[in-house]
Amino acid sequence: MSRKVFLVGDGAVGSTFANDLLQNTTVDELAIFDVAKDRPVGDSMDLEDITPFTGQTNIHPAEYSDAKDADVCVITAGVPRKPGETRLDLVNKNVKILKTIVDPVVESGFKGVFVVSANPVDILTTLTQKISGFPKDRVIGTGTSLDSMRLRVELAKKLNVPVAKVNSMVLGEHGDTSFENFDESTVDNKPLRDYSEINDNVLSEIESDVRKKGGKIITNKGATFYGVAMMLTQIVSAILDNRSICLPLSAPINGEYGIKHDLYLGTPTIINGNGIEKVIETKLSDVEKAKMINSADKMQEVLSGVEM
């Protein structure tokens, strides 16, 4: 394996991811493409300056033909969410951009794994698979992994424990129909609901805080990028290292949870060097299962109206 990454989109998320990736795993080659041609030139030179500490990497601006021998193609390119916008508001803008990316990457001869983080990520991951014609296990989206990290942070703050001791996930759409899987959540291997500080009102407040956090970050600084860049780093590192990890990602649904639609949605997913190793149907209450189906129905409704 050449340990080559082809990055499409060198904005705030893309450049932060590139920096994080180089500091967290070995990368032989990082090829960066952006429609703003000057930016990858500048970032390639800037990132070179950390290689005395991170190890030797061939970092360079790229064209789509450079995707041919990459192990991973990371798609961060797209119109970012503005204050007051939902992720779904971005659909038709970013679908048009997506097609201009996926087609030439496939035409280059790329045979690796697509990793998508552009929003709305469940929709764009589904469409990346359909446009590319790739096997579903070789297309992955960041899904609800960032939402889940935000949930863990909020629970850790509430219970005054290290975040590493919190095991909790957000499932469904990376967006307004997502939901927290509180019944299966644990803190220091103890069920979350066993803690005296936790009740339905507290959980409702935490759920609201998690859902609103992205919008608050955008209102205050214009964009979110540190969190999602680190999630991308975890995903891509696992692929390059051929290391199995489980994260709540946009994964292909094949009847799990009683969902009838052919789409990608946030669910626990084991990935490795080949892409998706296993999609896990986690235990849900009847209420949570109804929320999962509702999330899928909403995504299908949006997909049905997409202008390709």
From Swiss-Prot:
Record: active site: H174
Keywords: Cytoplasm, NAD, Oxidoreductase
GO BP term, pick one: glycolytic process
Binding-site residues, substrate: R87, N119, P120, V121, D122, D147, S148, M149, R150, T224
GO MF annotations, alphabetized: L-lactate dehydrogenase activity
Location(s) in or outside the cell: Cytoplasm
Listed GO CC annotations: cytoplasm
Similarity annotation: Belongs to the LDH/MDH superfamily. LDH family.
Protein name according to UniProt: L-lactate dehydrogenase 2
Annotated gene: ldh2
